[in-house]
């Protein structure tokens, strides 16, 4: 594994990892982690796709893992989108796929919709933060909007419990004892990405990148109806599947093997379909 740094536009250092070197790789996969976690929680995910012919990269988002920045804070949505863009510029663009989970899925879908990159072959959205199960109350939301203008970097406990992540006890124990996970979220991060999720749903029909959406049927953090609505609003480019007996992290739960194989088959289908079209030209 090779590690390197990428500098953000506000001079933070982001920790990037290249998981393998593969000659004649099928494609490149970049993993974007969720809130309060870090890229090394995806070691098994990276190894699976590396063992199946993909060159795999990942990075710790600002304020997470080994990257710099206040824990759980961002100056704004577009900083995260710019961070992702800078990371992608350092990667091979041969059959480039992006894989974003939860908060990382929110970053990814907004990157695709707002930046409109023309070099992405496909995207995988895992439990993408589009709608929250526990919506903020009107008064709480109003107070947060007011406070974020005064103290945007103020952080508080995100109240995320590992019990809601997975049915697998070992996954929960490792999360709770991981020194690189944290439970912080700033007012700015919450408001920007809460609104960005709503915006993405309204603009779902504008997505023009082949996308696979995955969600656990028993997710108590991010509402599966957001995934279903987004997919139904863009049947041309989006496919989705709901995994039963699965909580917030499909890649870490009872259907893990099914999730891996289903996603791999989809990636390979996109590659082979594009190759067939190229041969016909």
Per-region residue spans from a language model:
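Catalytic active-site module of serine/aspartate enzymes centered on a nucleophile-bearing elbow/loop
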Residues: 237-281
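Active-site glycine-rich loops that stabilize anionic/oxyanionic intermediates
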Residues: 34-37, 217
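N-terminal cap/lid segment of alpha/beta-hydrolase-fold proteins
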Residues: 1-23
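Short alpha-helix in the alpha/beta-hydrolase fold that links the catalytic acid
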Residues: 209, 223-232
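Catalytic nucleophile-loop/oxyanion-hole region of alpha/beta-hydrolase
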Residues: 36-38, 65-91, 95
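Short beta-strand/loop motif that positions the catalytic acidic residue
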Residues: 207, 213-215, 219
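Conserved alpha/beta-hydrolase
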Residues: 46-69
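Alpha/beta-hydrolase-fold enzymes
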Residues: 97, 103-186
């Amino acid at each position: 594994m090779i590690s390197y740094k990428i500098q953000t536009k506000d001079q933070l250092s982001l920790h990037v990892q290249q998981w393998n070197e593969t000659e004649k790789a099928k494609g490149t996969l970049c993993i974007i982690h969720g809130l309060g976690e870090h890229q090394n929680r995806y070691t098994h995910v990276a190894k699976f796709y590396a063992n199946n012919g993909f060159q795999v990269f990942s990075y710790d988002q600002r304020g997470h893992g080994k990257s710099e920045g206040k824990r759980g804070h961002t100056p704004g949505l577009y900083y995260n989108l710019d961070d992702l863009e800078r990371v992608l510029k350092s990667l091979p663009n041969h059959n480039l796929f992006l894989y974003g989970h939860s908060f990382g899925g929110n970053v990814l879908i907004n990157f695709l919709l707002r930046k409109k990159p023309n070099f992405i072959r496909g995207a995988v959205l895992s439990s993408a933060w589009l709608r929250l199960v526990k919506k903020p109350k009107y008064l709480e939301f109003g107070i947060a909007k007011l406070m974020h203008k005064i103290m945007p970097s103020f952080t508080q406990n995100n109240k995320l419990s590992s019990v809601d992540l997975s049915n697998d006890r070992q996954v929960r124990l490792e999360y709770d004892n991981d020194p690189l996970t944290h439970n912080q979220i700033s007012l700015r991060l919450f408001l920007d990405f809460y609104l960005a999720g709503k915006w993405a749903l309204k603009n779902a029909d504008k997505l023009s990148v082949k996308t696979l959406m995955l969600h656990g049927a028993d997710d108590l953090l991010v509402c599966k109806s957001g995934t279903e609505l987004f997919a139904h609003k863009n049947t041309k480019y989006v496919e989705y599947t709901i995994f039963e007996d699965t909580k917030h992290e499909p890649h870490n739960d009872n259907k893990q093997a099914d999730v891996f194989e289903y996603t791999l088959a989809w990636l390979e289908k996109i590659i082979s379909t594009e190759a067939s079209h190229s041969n016909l030209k």
